[in-house]
UniProtKB/Swiss-Prot annotation:
Thioredoxin domain: residues covered: 2-105
Family: Belongs to the thioredoxin family.
InterPro entries, per the entry: Thioredoxin, Thioredoxin-like_sf, Thioredoxin_CS, Thioredoxin_domain
Superkingdom: Bacteria
Pfam families: Thioredoxin (PF00085)
Entry GO MF terms: protein-disulfide reductase activity
Protein name: Thioredoxin
Cross-referenced Gene3D superfamilies: Glutaredoxin
This protein's GO CC annotations: cytosol
Function text: Participates in various redox reactions through the reversible oxidation of its active center dithiol to a disulfide and catalyzes dithiol-disulfide exchange reactions.
Cysteine pairings via disulfide bonds: C30-C33
Source organism (scientific name): Treponema pallidum (strain Nichols)
Length: 105
């Protein structure tokens, strides 16, 4: 399964209808974001259907970056039952992402 593309058209539905969602705020020109992408894909393949992991391109949806107070990328925001419960700024490794999931599951 591929990472979900998140945009203004589906962000609300995604975070409100899934119990645990991680949104990666990224941009195609961001080096750290490019490094984080494959790590997120690996995490997603390990955790299965219990967690939705999606990517939101801040260049395409600048208003959402502002709404969610994203000032630096990459930023991972963890939503549980529709509410933000955690966030991580900058590149993080697989173990940190798995810890975010376990802590908030």
């Amino acid at each position: 399964m591929a990472l979900l593309d998140i945009s203004s058209g589906n962000v609300r539905k995604t975070i409100e209808t899934n119990p645990l969602v991680i949104v990666d705020f990224w941009a195609p020109w961001c080096g750290s974001c490019k490094m984080l992408g494959p790590v997120l894909e690996e995490v997603e393949s390990e955790v299965g259907s219990g967690v939705v992991i999606g990517k939101l391109n801040v260049d395409d949806d600048q208003d959402l970056a502002v709404e969610f107070n994203v000032a630096s990328i990459p930023t991972l925001i963890v939503f549980k039952d529709g509410k933000e419960v955690d966030r991580s700024i900058g590149f993080v490794d697989k173990s940190k992402i798995l810890t975010l999931i376990q802590k908030n599951a």
